[in-house]
UniProtKB/Swiss-Prot annotation:
Known partners and oligomeric status: Part of the photosystem II complex. PSII is composed of 1 copy each of membrane proteins PsbA, PsbB, PsbC, PsbD, numerous small proteins, at least 3 peripheral proteins of the oxygen-evolving complex and a large number of cofactors. It forms dimeric complexes.
Signal peptide (from-to): none
Membrane topology: Single-pass membrane protein
Protein name: Photosystem II reaction center W protein, chloroplastic
Family affiliation: Belongs to the psbW family.
Pfam families found in the cross-reference section: PsbW
One GO CC annotation: photosystem II
Gene expressing this chain: psbW
Lineage of producing organism: Eukaryota, Viridiplantae, Streptophyta, Embryophyta, Tracheophyta
Stromal side: 124-137
Length: 137
């Protein structure tokens, strides 16, 4: 059995939401009652071109070589990932072509393709070829 109780905390929350706290850079939005950020009209972008020195180049090359060495060591030491395949997982990640876990599914796929091809062949052979048909070169 569910009961509903009323308390005065709801009115406190309502009163707290009506209190207006003005913050620097924030103006109140009269539409939704939500604060909106004030817009600053000036945006300054700058770029500096620092000449590369040989010290930074050698440091970059050393760090690149160290990271490549660490990646190669991790790749050679780690074992290949083996998947635990359960019947509930079907054929995901097992490497079977087209995800066919049963030979009957392959024959069904081949039969549907053959049926569609045969129906198209019968349909196309009944078309009359004239200059405007687009079937002849």
């Amino acid at each position: 059995m569910a009961t509903i109780t009323a308390s005065s905390s709801a009115s406190l929350v309502a009163r707290a939401s009506l209190v207006h706290n003005s913050r620097v850079g924030v103006s109140s939005s009269p539409i939704l009652g939500l604060p909106s950020m004030t817009k600053r009209s000036k945006v300054t972008c700058s770029i500096e071109n620092k000449p590369s020195t040989t010290e930074t180049t050698t440091t970059t090359n050393k760090s690149m070589g160290a990271s490549l060495l660490a990646a190669a060591a991790a790749a050679t030491i780690s074992n290949p990932a083996m998947a635990l395949v359960d019947e509930r997982m079907s054929t995901e990640g097992t490497g079977l072509p087209f995800g066919l876990s049963n030979n009957l599914l392959g024959w069904i796929l081949f039969g549907v393709f053959g049926l569609i091809w045969a129906l198209y062949f019968v349909y196309a052979s009944g078309l009359e070829e004239d200059e405007e048909s687009g079937l002849s070169l």
